[in-house]
Amino acid sequence: MSTANPPLPPVIEFRNVGKIWNPGTRREFKALDNINFCIDDLPGRGEMIAILGPSGCGKSTMLNLLAGFQEVFPPTSGEILVRGQPVTGPGLDRGMVFQKYSSFPHLTVYENVRFGLDLNRDKLGLEEPEIDRRCREWLKKVGLDAHLEKYPHQLSGGQQQRVAIARTLVVKPRIILMDEPFSALDEPTRLEMQRLLVELWAEVEATVLLVTHSIIEGVFLGDRVWLFSRAPGRIVKEFRDLPAPAPGVHPLQVQRTPAFLEAVERVSAVFRKIEAGEPVD
Protein backbone atom coordinates (compact mmCIF):
# COMPACT_ATOMS: atom_id res chain seq x y z
CA MET A 1 0.00 0.00 0.00
CA SER A 2 1.44 3.36 -1.05
CA THR A 3 2.20 5.89 1.69
CA ALA A 4 3.24 8.68 -0.68
CA ASN A 5 1.89 12.08 0.24
CA PRO A 6 -0.60 13.59 -2.21
CA PRO A 7 0.88 16.35 -4.40
CA LEU A 8 0.60 19.85 -3.01
CA PRO A 9 -1.58 22.33 -4.90
CA PRO A 10 0.28 25.14 -6.67
CA VAL A 11 1.40 27.86 -4.30
CA ILE A 12 -0.06 30.38 -6.79
CA GLU A 13 -2.47 29.78 -9.66
CA PHE A 14 -4.07 32.28 -12.04
CA ARG A 15 -6.97 30.95 -14.11
CA ASN A 16 -7.97 33.15 -17.06
CA VAL A 17 -7.55 36.32 -15.01
CA GLY A 18 -8.47 39.63 -16.61
CA LYS A 19 -8.85 43.15 -15.28
CA ILE A 20 -10.76 46.03 -16.85
CA TRP A 21 -10.71 49.48 -15.29
CA ASN A 22 -13.86 51.63 -15.50
CA PRO A 23 -15.87 49.07 -17.50
CA GLY A 24 -18.74 50.42 -19.55
CA THR A 25 -17.46 54.00 -19.53
CA ARG A 26 -15.46 56.13 -21.96
CA ARG A 27 -12.48 55.60 -19.65
CA GLU A 28 -12.62 51.81 -19.97
CA PHE A 29 -9.14 50.29 -20.06
CA LYS A 30 -8.24 46.62 -20.28
CA ALA A 31 -5.18 46.15 -18.09
CA LEU A 32 -4.84 42.34 -18.04
CA ASP A 33 -6.02 39.75 -20.53
CA ASN A 34 -6.36 36.03 -19.87
CA ILE A 35 -3.46 35.52 -17.43
CA ASN A 36 -2.82 31.82 -16.79
CA PHE A 37 0.02 30.30 -14.78
CA CYS A 38 0.85 27.88 -11.97
CA ILE A 39 3.78 28.17 -9.57
CA ASP A 40 4.51 24.89 -7.84
CA ASP A 41 5.00 24.57 -4.09
CA LEU A 42 8.60 23.34 -4.16
CA PRO A 43 9.80 21.40 -1.10
CA GLY A 44 12.27 23.37 0.98
CA ARG A 45 12.37 26.46 -1.22
CA GLY A 46 10.31 28.82 -3.31
CA GLU A 47 10.97 30.26 -6.73
CA MET A 48 11.82 33.85 -7.49
CA ILE A 49 10.11 35.01 -10.66
CA ALA A 50 11.10 38.35 -12.19
CA ILE A 51 8.43 40.15 -14.22
CA LEU A 52 9.33 42.67 -16.91
CA GLY A 53 7.28 44.52 -19.48
CA PRO A 54 6.49 47.92 -21.00
CA SER A 55 5.13 50.66 -18.76
CA GLY A 56 1.40 50.35 -18.12
CA CYS A 57 1.19 46.70 -19.14
CA GLY A 58 -0.45 45.50 -15.92
CA LYS A 59 2.50 44.07 -13.98
CA SER A 60 1.68 45.96 -10.80
CA THR A 61 -2.03 45.32 -11.28
CA MET A 62 -1.32 41.58 -11.30
CA LEU A 63 0.64 41.82 -8.03
CA ASN A 64 -2.07 43.90 -6.40
CA LEU A 65 -4.74 41.40 -7.45
CA LEU A 66 -2.71 38.58 -5.92
CA ALA A 67 -2.29 40.65 -2.75
CA GLY A 68 -6.08 41.07 -2.64
CA PHE A 69 -5.94 44.85 -2.26
CA GLN A 70 -9.37 46.44 -2.17
CA GLU A 71 -8.49 49.15 -4.72
CA VAL A 72 -7.92 46.48 -7.40
CA PHE A 73 -9.70 43.34 -6.23
CA PRO A 74 -11.55 41.39 -7.51
CA PRO A 75 -10.45 40.61 -11.07
CA THR A 76 -12.97 41.34 -13.80
CA SER A 77 -12.74 37.73 -14.91
CA GLY A 78 -11.07 34.52 -13.81
CA GLU A 79 -9.89 33.19 -10.48
CA ILE A 80 -6.77 33.50 -8.32
CA LEU A 81 -5.81 30.70 -5.93
CA VAL A 82 -3.14 30.41 -3.25
CA ARG A 83 -2.41 26.83 -2.22
CA GLY A 84 -5.67 25.75 -3.80
CA GLN A 85 -7.85 28.31 -1.99
CA PRO A 86 -9.47 31.27 -3.78
CA VAL A 87 -8.05 34.67 -2.89
CA THR A 88 -10.79 36.84 -1.40
CA GLY A 89 -8.70 39.66 0.05
CA PRO A 90 -5.37 40.35 1.81
CA GLY A 91 -3.85 37.61 3.96
CA LEU A 92 -0.87 36.93 6.19
CA ASP A 93 0.38 34.37 3.68
CA ARG A 94 1.22 37.23 1.28
CA GLY A 95 3.53 40.14 2.03
CA MET A 96 4.35 43.10 -0.19
CA VAL A 97 7.28 45.48 -0.60
CA PHE A 98 6.51 48.61 -2.63
CA GLN A 99 8.58 50.95 -4.76
CA LYS A 100 7.70 53.94 -2.58
CA TYR A 101 8.96 53.95 0.98
CA SER A 102 6.04 52.74 3.06
CA SER A 103 7.17 53.05 6.67
CA PHE A 104 4.93 54.84 9.13
CA PRO A 105 6.67 58.20 9.71
CA HIS A 106 5.56 58.50 13.35
CA LEU A 107 6.93 55.07 14.34
CA THR A 108 10.53 54.08 15.02
CA VAL A 109 12.32 51.44 12.96
CA TYR A 110 11.62 48.86 15.66
CA GLU A 111 7.95 49.86 15.93
CA ASN A 112 7.53 49.73 12.15
CA VAL A 113 8.91 46.21 11.95
CA ARG A 114 6.71 44.90 14.75
CA PHE A 115 3.56 46.63 13.48
CA GLY A 116 2.22 43.62 11.56
CA LEU A 117 2.99 41.24 14.41
CA ASP A 118 1.16 43.45 16.91
CA LEU A 119 -1.81 43.79 14.58
CA ASN A 120 -2.07 40.03 14.08
CA ARG A 121 -0.67 38.63 17.32
CA ASP A 122 -3.83 36.63 18.07
CA LYS A 123 -3.96 35.09 14.58
CA LEU A 124 -0.28 34.25 14.77
CA GLY A 125 -0.46 33.04 18.37
CA LEU A 126 2.48 35.17 19.46
CA GLU A 127 3.37 36.47 22.91
CA GLU A 128 5.45 39.57 23.60
CA PRO A 129 8.82 37.80 24.08
CA GLU A 130 8.54 36.09 20.68
CA ILE A 131 7.44 39.31 18.94
CA ASP A 132 10.42 41.17 20.39
CA ARG A 133 12.82 38.33 19.53
CA ARG A 134 11.62 38.12 15.92
CA CYS A 135 11.85 41.87 15.38
CA ARG A 136 15.37 42.13 16.74
CA GLU A 137 16.43 39.06 14.75
CA TRP A 138 15.19 40.48 11.44
CA LEU A 139 16.54 43.95 12.11
CA LYS A 140 19.94 42.36 12.63
CA LYS A 141 19.60 40.35 9.42
CA VAL A 142 18.92 43.49 7.39
CA GLY A 143 21.71 45.40 9.13
CA LEU A 144 19.58 47.83 11.13
CA ASP A 145 20.11 46.54 14.66
CA ALA A 146 21.97 49.77 15.51
CA HIS A 147 19.08 51.93 14.26
CA LEU A 148 16.10 50.59 16.24
CA GLU A 149 15.09 53.94 17.73
CA LYS A 150 15.49 56.03 14.60
CA TYR A 151 12.55 57.36 12.59
CA PRO A 152 12.14 56.88 8.82
CA HIS A 153 13.16 60.47 8.01
CA GLN A 154 16.53 59.77 9.65
CA LEU A 155 17.27 56.87 7.27
CA SER A 156 18.65 56.66 3.75
CA GLY A 157 16.53 55.24 0.94
CA GLY A 158 18.29 51.89 1.14
CA GLN A 159 17.77 51.74 4.89
CA GLN A 160 14.07 52.51 4.48
CA GLN A 161 13.71 49.60 2.06
CA ARG A 162 15.52 47.39 4.57
CA VAL A 163 12.82 48.34 7.09
CA ALA A 164 10.12 47.40 4.57
CA ILE A 165 11.76 44.05 3.84
CA ALA A 166 12.17 43.24 7.55
CA ARG A 167 8.56 44.24 8.27
CA THR A 168 7.39 41.90 5.50
CA LEU A 169 9.59 38.91 6.34
CA VAL A 170 9.08 39.03 10.11
CA VAL A 171 5.51 37.78 9.57
CA LYS A 172 6.89 34.76 7.64
CA PRO A 173 4.65 35.00 4.54
CA ARG A 174 4.65 32.12 2.07
CA ILE A 175 4.53 34.57 -0.84
CA ILE A 176 6.46 37.84 -1.16
CA LEU A 177 5.36 40.40 -3.75
CA MET A 178 7.90 43.09 -4.66
CA ASP A 179 6.90 45.99 -6.92
CA GLU A 180 10.09 47.66 -8.20
CA PRO A 181 11.49 47.83 -4.65
CA PHE A 182 14.95 49.08 -5.63
CA SER A 183 14.17 51.37 -8.57
CA ALA A 184 14.53 54.61 -6.58
CA LEU A 185 17.97 53.68 -5.22
CA ASP A 186 21.37 54.69 -6.56
CA GLU A 187 23.38 51.96 -8.29
CA PRO A 188 25.73 50.97 -5.41
CA THR A 189 22.80 50.78 -2.98
CA ARG A 190 20.73 48.85 -5.50
CA LEU A 191 23.48 46.24 -5.90
CA GLU A 192 23.79 45.93 -2.13
CA MET A 193 20.03 45.42 -1.81
CA GLN A 194 20.13 42.74 -4.51
CA ARG A 195 22.84 40.95 -2.54
CA LEU A 196 20.81 41.22 0.66
CA LEU A 197 17.67 39.90 -1.03
CA VAL A 198 19.52 36.83 -2.31
CA GLU A 199 20.80 36.06 1.20
CA LEU A 200 17.42 36.55 2.91
CA TRP A 201 15.52 34.60 0.25
CA ALA A 202 17.82 31.62 0.84
CA GLU A 203 16.59 31.61 4.46
CA VAL A 204 12.85 32.19 4.17
CA GLU A 205 11.92 29.58 1.52
CA ALA A 206 9.21 31.88 0.15
CA THR A 207 7.93 32.27 -3.39
CA VAL A 208 8.84 35.74 -4.65
CA LEU A 209 7.25 37.67 -7.53
CA LEU A 210 9.45 40.64 -8.37
CA VAL A 211 8.35 43.38 -10.78
CA THR A 212 11.34 45.30 -12.12
CA HIS A 213 12.13 47.59 -15.06
CA SER A 214 15.77 46.41 -15.06
CA ILE A 215 16.54 43.44 -17.30
CA ILE A 216 19.88 43.00 -15.54
CA GLU A 217 18.16 42.85 -12.14
CA GLY A 218 15.51 40.45 -13.42
CA VAL A 219 18.04 38.05 -14.94
CA PHE A 220 20.23 38.22 -11.83
CA LEU A 221 17.48 37.57 -9.28
CA GLY A 222 15.02 35.41 -11.17
CA ASP A 223 14.81 31.63 -11.39
CA ARG A 224 12.50 32.55 -14.23
CA VAL A 225 11.83 35.77 -16.11
CA TRP A 226 8.39 36.54 -17.49
CA LEU A 227 7.92 39.15 -20.19
CA PHE A 228 4.56 40.89 -20.43
CA SER A 229 3.02 42.19 -23.63
CA ARG A 230 1.93 45.77 -24.06
CA ALA A 231 -1.51 46.45 -22.54
CA PRO A 232 -3.68 44.52 -22.14
CA GLY A 233 -0.95 42.61 -20.37
CA ARG A 234 -0.37 38.91 -20.73
CA ILE A 235 2.68 36.69 -20.35
CA VAL A 236 4.19 36.26 -23.83
CA LYS A 237 7.62 34.80 -23.03
CA GLU A 238 9.29 32.88 -20.23
CA PHE A 239 13.02 32.40 -19.73
CA ARG A 240 14.49 29.63 -17.58
CA ASP A 241 17.99 28.25 -16.94
CA LEU A 242 19.36 31.64 -15.93
CA PRO A 243 22.70 32.17 -14.13
CA ALA A 244 21.95 31.63 -10.45
CA PRO A 245 23.19 34.07 -7.80
CA ALA A 246 24.68 32.64 -4.63
CA PRO A 247 24.53 34.03 -1.08
CA GLY A 248 27.70 35.91 -0.21
CA VAL A 249 28.63 36.65 -3.83
CA HIS A 250 28.56 40.28 -4.92
CA PRO A 251 26.12 40.84 -7.81
CA LEU A 252 28.83 42.27 -10.07
CA GLN A 253 30.79 39.00 -9.85
CA VAL A 254 27.85 37.32 -11.58
CA GLN A 255 26.72 40.18 -13.78
CA ARG A 256 30.09 40.48 -15.55
CA THR A 257 30.31 36.83 -16.61
CA PRO A 258 29.82 35.83 -20.28
CA ALA A 259 26.92 33.51 -19.38
CA PHE A 260 25.09 36.31 -17.60
CA LEU A 261 25.65 38.83 -20.38
CA GLU A 262 24.40 36.31 -22.94
CA ALA A 263 21.23 35.74 -20.90
CA VAL A 264 20.64 39.50 -20.65
CA GLU A 265 20.95 39.84 -24.42
CA ARG A 266 18.47 37.00 -25.01
CA VAL A 267 15.89 38.68 -22.79
CA SER A 268 16.66 42.14 -24.20
CA ALA A 269 16.15 40.98 -27.79
CA VAL A 270 12.63 39.76 -27.03
CA PHE A 271 11.86 42.83 -24.93
CA ARG A 272 12.79 45.08 -27.84
CA LYS A 273 10.32 43.18 -30.04
CA ILE A 274 7.56 43.67 -27.48
CA GLU A 275 8.21 47.40 -27.23
CA ALA A 276 8.20 47.67 -31.04
CA GLY A 277 4.90 45.81 -31.27
CA GLU A 278 6.47 42.92 -33.18
CA PRO A 279 5.31 39.30 -32.77
CA VAL A 280 7.19 37.20 -30.19
CA ASP A 281 8.07 33.58 -30.90
Where do the protein language model's features map onto the residues?
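Conserved ABC ATPase "signature" region
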Residues: 85, 118, 126-147, 199
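Hydrophobic anchor residue at the start of the ABC signature
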Residues: 165
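A short, proline-enriched helix->beta-strand linker immediately N-terminal to the Walker B motif
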Residues: 170-174
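Catalytic Walker B motif of ABC-type/P-loop ATPase nucleotide-binding domains
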Residues: 176-179
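Conserved ABC transporter NBD signature motif
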Residues: 75-89
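Conserved ABC ATPase signature
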Residues: 151-155, 159
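Helix-to-loop junction immediately C-terminal to a conserved catalytic motif
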Residues: 67-70
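Short coil-to-helix segment of the ABC ATPase nucleotide-binding domain corresponding to the Q-loop/switch region
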Residues: 107-116
